[in-house]
């Protein structure tokens, strides 16, 4: 019997954990460059924490009765030492842990920012993934409403820098612990009247985390949630003054907002100010950035009592908006694609490509796909497909004469009759290319 060749199974990525392909990477780089420039303008410093943390960090920090801890964390036991570990579902707790562990606050407040992947085990859908990326800020050691207003202003400035419109700000105050406790008693009394019509999620939260019932997305419970006792009515003088101070600063800076009494956020560490930036352009996943104040968290994780506030935004959702509004920038090609014909020409072309890179130009050198020399036509086709501005052509005749061919592929120089191959002395190649690119850019601006 003839032995058939076994078919090798094709492996695929994990559902909800997506590859970022080269055609999309340019948009990511554009966003990252824009947000990093903004963060520098506000004096924030980058911090990078591990993807894996002790599970206890999140159960203590986020709260044991939150959806994230109960249902969404990727947790495992380390086979080497039995430690319970978790792939970070968010990064505020990790930044706070790092600031305590490394005594970062001993010499005063800190403005920190992070960017990277987070992980939650949930059903993948548009705008919601199992691996997703966030950029966030943490302002540690600032107690006043001015810090709250500043981090909110940063978001508005980012929307402006990106050209995004239609992202609206909603704010609320969760008050202090004793105010939330008084509200909790009345809220449970109110919700108990509807125990027979509450869905399973609401029943589960009724006595463990009743505040989250107000955030229900179930259409059948909207009237119940809308008419529930409002936490804002339980605020004391200190909490009310903080919230009013925030509103004054936002109004003074022409930032429109809506007070949403049902805005409670899904993490237990928040107090006083909470906020969300929302859009109606992404369907059900309309929150693109969210945050607030978390004054108790640093002490809760073993540090000294320290005020703090921050936000996180979902990068995938913002990129979706950029595409939706046709704001994605065109992906730029390299400056030069080096083409060659003949062995001697190939060696000279290889050397020239390195010298061009020495001057700061971006250069692709044509490498053989199969080990055999490629035709001039196929190389020029590759050069055009690469998006390069110019093709630099080395042939045996040009090398013998100490010259090189240059042909414009993009920009004003590639248009009309003037798009002919020019012969340039090798020693003048760099100067010629730089002058040609400057001239092409100026023609394009006219």
Swiss-Prot record:
Record-linked InterPro entries: aa-tRNA-synth_II, aa-tRNA-synth_II/BPL/LPL, Anticodon-bd, Anticodon-bd_dom_sf, His-tRNA-ligase, HisRS-like_core, HisRS/HisZ, HisRS_anticodon
Keyword Coiled coil: no
Subcellular location: Cytoplasm
Gene3D superfamilies on file: Anticodon-binding domain (3.40.50.800), Bira Bifunctional Protein, Domain 2 (3.30.930.10)
CC terms in the record's Gene Ontology section: cytoplasm
EC number: 6.1.1.21
Alphabetized UniProt keyword annotations: Aminoacyl-tRNA synthetase, ATP-binding, Cytoplasm, Ligase, Nucleotide-binding, Protein biosynthesis
Pfam families in alphabetical order: HGTP_anticodon, tRNA-synt_His
Record-linked CDD domains: HisRS-like_core (cd00773), HisRS_anticodon (cd00859)
Coiled coil feature spans: none
GO molecular function: ATP binding; histidine-tRNA ligase activity
Catalysed reaction equations from the record: tRNA(His) + L-histidine + ATP = L-histidyl-tRNA(His) + AMP + diphosphate + H(+)
SUBUNIT field: Homodimer.
Family: Belongs to the class-II aminoacyl-tRNA synthetase family.
Protein name: Histidine--tRNA ligase
